[in-house]
């Protein structure tokens, strides 16, 4: 009872604090920097991270097994991963806009996890025999961290596409801090060049104003961080798939069975392998790689929620239909 109450308190504190953090980010989009706002959002996300960490540890001790057994626990762990990738740019003293793009992921996953749809999963249950393996921690943690990193990196690529095609919500045009995003800009000419070539390109590129230059710098920053985060997520995903294959051979006698989860995991891996390859090819880099990563954003959600929504295949543990 004590553990259940503590878990309930930590869940609602983390959700409330991250809601405040999102509000702070939205306010800073429309007004000039207010003293203390950025520090408040950073401290707020640290509190959220600590609350989610405490929630996972509490559930671990209360259930007697790692909190990776169902959709609810995996969503909590996913939001924990999002909060980590949110804080990395902040501690690197990067612009606040990167964290603003990533921050909604935390509240969406945390909100869905605590919603009434997953009420039956909130109570800890005995781990099913198929999941009672030492591979559980390696496989599931690597897969979810991979999902979190790839989703964050893909979000930055989506932001690049939105800025490039100038499809932002018109009301944001009133923001002094974001107005530079709406100036004319020949993005195709830049194509994410490296530092050695940047000066040459800048000399032949016509910027109508300093705001145009800031827009270019912002796109470069999004691309640089997106590539780093996706590269890290790809490593996590690869380790997760390989460890899952070994576990599958021990549990089912086959390394690969092509059930829905495995198939979509392979599709996800392929999409981001194409993305990383396109980054090495100057003919495909730039806008093309951002499009590939944006497609990967949708593919990950299909891979993550697909089996849980359908409740089919060998990976249907903790799905909606199984409850």
UniProtKB/Swiss-Prot annotation:
GO terms for biological process, alphabetical: cytochrome complex assembly
Keyword terms, alphabetized: Chloroplast, Cytochrome c-type biogenesis, Membrane, Plastid, Thylakoid, Transmembrane, Transmembrane helix
GO molecular function, one term: heme binding
One Gene Ontology cellular component annotation held by this UniProt entry: chloroplast thylakoid membrane
Source organism, top-level taxon: Eukaryota
Residue ranges of the TM segments: 17-37, 44-64, 68-88, 98-118, 143-163, 229-249, 262-279, 291-311
Subcellular location: Plastid, Chloroplast thylakoid membrane
Topology relative to the membrane: Multi-pass membrane protein
Main location: plastid
NCBIfam families per record: cytochr_II_ccsB
Function according to Swiss-Prot or TrEMBL: Required during biogenesis of c-type cytochromes (cytochrome c6 and cytochrome f) at the step of heme attachment.
Family (UniProt): Belongs to the CcmF/CycK/Ccl1/NrfE/CcsA family.
Subunit structure: May interact with Ccs1.
PANTHER family, alphabetized: CYTOCHROME B_B6 PROTEIN-RELATED (PTHR30071:SF1), HEME EXPORTER PROTEIN C (PTHR30071)
Protein name from the UniProt record: Cytochrome c biogenesis protein CcsA
Originating organism: Lotus japonicus
């Amino acid at each position: 009872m004590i553990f259940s109450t503590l878990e309930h308190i930590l869940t609602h504190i983390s959700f409330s604090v991250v809601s405040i953090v999102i509000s702070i980010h939205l306010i800073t989009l429309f007004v000039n920097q207010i003293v203390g706002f950025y520090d408040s959002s950073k401290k707020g996300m640290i509190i959220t991270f600590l609350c989610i960490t405490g929630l996972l540890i509490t559930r671990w001790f209360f259930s007697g097994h790692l909190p990776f057994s169902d959709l609810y626990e995996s969503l909590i762990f996913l939001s924990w991963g999002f909060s980590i990738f949110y804080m990395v740019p902040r501690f690197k003293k990067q612009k606040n806009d990167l964290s603003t793009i990533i921050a909604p992921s935390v509240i969406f996953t945390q909100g869905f996890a605590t919603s009434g749809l997953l009420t039956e999963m909130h109570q800890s249950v005995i781990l099913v025999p198929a999941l009672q393996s030492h591979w559980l921690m390696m496989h599931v943690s690597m897969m979810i961290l991979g999902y979190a990193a790839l989703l964050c990196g893909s979000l930055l690529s989506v932001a690049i596409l939105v800025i490039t095609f100038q499809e932002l919500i018109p009301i944001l045009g009133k923001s002094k801090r974001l107005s530079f995003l709406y100036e004319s800009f020949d993005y195709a000419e830049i194509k994410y060049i490296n530092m050695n070539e940047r000066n040459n390109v800048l000399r032949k590129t016509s910027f109508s104003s300093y705001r145009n230059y800031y827009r270019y710098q912002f796109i470069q920053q999004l691309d640089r961080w997106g590539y780093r985060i996706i590269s890290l997520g790809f490593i996590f995903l690869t380790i997760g798939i390989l460890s899952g294959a070994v576990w599958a051979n021990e549990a089912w006698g086959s390394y690969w069975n092509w059930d829905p989860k495995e198939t979509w995991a392979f599709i996800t891996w392929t999409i981001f392998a194409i993305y990383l390859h396109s980054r090495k090819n100057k003919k495909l880099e730039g806008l093309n790689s951002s499009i590939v990563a944006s497609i990967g954003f949708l593919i990950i959600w299909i891979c993550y929620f697909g089996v849980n929504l359908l409740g089919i295949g060998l990976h249907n543990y903790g799905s909606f239909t199984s409850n």
